[in-house]
């Protein structure tokens, strides 16, 4: 199944979190915090302005982004957990 976000929404896949600390301690799944970074998989066309034209989003497919722990709505697609959120829920684009 493929999702196509509407309006100013983006679809993000959380990046995998490290399961081991720098000192070698293994963190169990139930104790680990959800990662707050992800990769943008799809973007909507944007919001409309007063004239009815779309205002393009500031992020694009493939961008690595930062977001809040509780941002977005979690959905399962083909066994993957994805987040659907508004662009305004994104804090930043991580530049390489």
Swiss-Prot record:
Q: Which gene encodes it?
A: groES
Q: Which one Pfam family would you cite for this protein?
A: Cpn10
- Annotated signal sequence is none
What NCBIfam families does the database record attribute to this sequence?
PRK00364.1-2, PRK00364.1-5, PRK00364.2-2, PRK00364.2-4
Q: How does it assemble?
A: Heptamer of 7 subunits arranged in a ring. Interacts with the chaperonin GroEL.
Q: Major place of localization?
A: cytoplasm
Spell out the SMART domains in the cross-references: Cpn10
Does Lipid metabolism count among this protein's keywords?
A: no
One Gene Ontology BP term is: chaperone cofactor-dependent protein refolding
User: What name is this protein filed under?
Assistant: Co-chaperonin GroES
Gene3D superfamilies under this entry? GroES chaperonin
């Amino acid at each position: 199944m493929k999702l196509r976000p509407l309006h100013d929404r983006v679809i993000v896949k959380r990046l995998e979190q490290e399961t081991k600390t720098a000192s070698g301690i293994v963190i169990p799944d139930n104790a680990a915090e959800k990662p707050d970074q992800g990769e943008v998989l799809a973007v909507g066309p944007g919001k409309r302005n007063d004239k009815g034209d779309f205002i393009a989003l500031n992020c694009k497919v493939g961008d690595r982004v930062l977001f809040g722990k509780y941002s977005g709505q979690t959905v399962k697609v083909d066994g993957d957990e994805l987040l659907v959120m508004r662009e305004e829920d994104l804090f930043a684009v991580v530049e390489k």
